């Protein structure tokens, strides 16, 4: 049996030989440091020096094709033409679930929370060490590989709700409903483990990530939004049940 250290080393080696990373950073010194550091780790790295070029690269099917997609975006917030927050927000609005690591010189809790709330998966404050950036990239890539390796060819059905993982699509009583990326991830997690009770902290870790710095009440807000879209009577929920003193369960 492989030891945990050997398994981790093997997984990191597999990630480095396969992962394709886009770096969108306008400061040449920082961009070159990131690109060179990631290439030394074995990743295939591409870069853009403004938000518009980065967006065009992400939307170019010849560059970001379904059979050879980008695996991670490292995105500065203060970018010319299209800023990082708007780019992140646009990608999530389009249903793009690629992991996004945001870089910023803004270190306040408000700025970090804003970056995560618009769809970033992680937030790293400048100045940072290359070692920490690489470690965060590995963590995001491991999570992405796990998601991709999870069988997604079966439709998940619970009473009147159907979730189609390959299409990131949900129908309720036969009608398609529009969910934000976080709402979709919450519902997918709940439907993967029906009747399991999840605490707010567990939901934060699974959906927002362990580095989330906001209030756990954001879970309650997203649950309320989901109930409004799923339940016949949100005040008497049939699907998303509050388990007082513990958290929430589905069904």
Curated annotation (Swiss-Prot):
GO BP, sorted A to Z: regulation of DNA-templated transcription
Origin superkingdom: Bacteria
UniProt keywords, alphabetically: DNA-binding, Phosphoprotein, Two-component regulatory system
4-aspartylphosphate: modified positions: 76
Residue ranges of the annotated DNA-binding region, renumbered to this chain: 153-251
Gene3D superfamilies named among the record's database cross-references: 3.40.50.2300, 6.10.250.690, Winged helix-like DNA-binding domain superfamily/Winged helix DNA-binding domain
GO MF entries: phosphorelay response regulator activity; transcription cis-regulatory region binding
Response regulatory domain ranges (all copies): 20-141
One Pfam family, short name: Response_reg
Post-translational modification: Phosphorylation.
Annotated Gene Ontology cellular component terms: cytosol; protein-DNA complex
Phosphoprotein among keywords: yes
PANTHER family: PHOSPHATE REGULON TRANSCRIPTIONAL REGULATORY PROTEIN PHOB, REGULATOR OF RPOS
Protein name: Probable transcriptional regulatory protein SYNPCC7002_A0851
Top-level taxonomy: Bacteria, Bacillati, Cyanobacteriota, Cyanophyceae, Oscillatoriophycideae
């Amino acid at each position: 049996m492989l030891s945990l250290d050997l398994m981790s080393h093997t997984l990191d080696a597999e990630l480095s030989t396969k992962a394709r990373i886009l770096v969108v950073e306008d400061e040449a010194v920082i961009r070159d440091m990131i690109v060179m550091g990631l290439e030394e780790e074995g990743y295939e790295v591409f870069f853009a020096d403004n938000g518009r070029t980065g967006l065009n690269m992400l939307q170019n099917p010849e560059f970001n094709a379904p059979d050879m997609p980008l695996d991670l975006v490292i995105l500065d917030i203060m970018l010319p033409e299209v800023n990082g927050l708007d780019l992140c927000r646009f990608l999530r609005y389009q249903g793009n679930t690629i992991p996004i690591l945001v870089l910023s010189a803004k270190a306040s809790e408000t700025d970090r929370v804003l970056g995560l709330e618009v769809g970033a998966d992680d937030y790293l404050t400048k100045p940072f060490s290359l070692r920490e950036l690489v470690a965060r990239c590995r963590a995001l890539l491991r999570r992405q590989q796990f998601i991709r390796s999870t069988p997604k060819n079966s439709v998940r059905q619970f009473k009147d709700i159907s979730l189609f993982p390959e299409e990131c699509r949900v129908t309720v009583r036969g009608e398609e409903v529009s969910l934000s990326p976080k709402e979709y991830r919450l519902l997918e997690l709940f439907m993967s483990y029906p009747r399991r009770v999840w605490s707010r902290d567990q939901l934060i870790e699974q959906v927002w990530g362990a580095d989330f710095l906001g209030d756990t009440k954001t879970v309650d807000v997203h649950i309320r939004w989901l109930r409004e879209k799923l339940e016949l009577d949100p005040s008497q929920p049939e699907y998303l049940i509050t388990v007082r003193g513990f958290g929430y369960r589905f069904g």
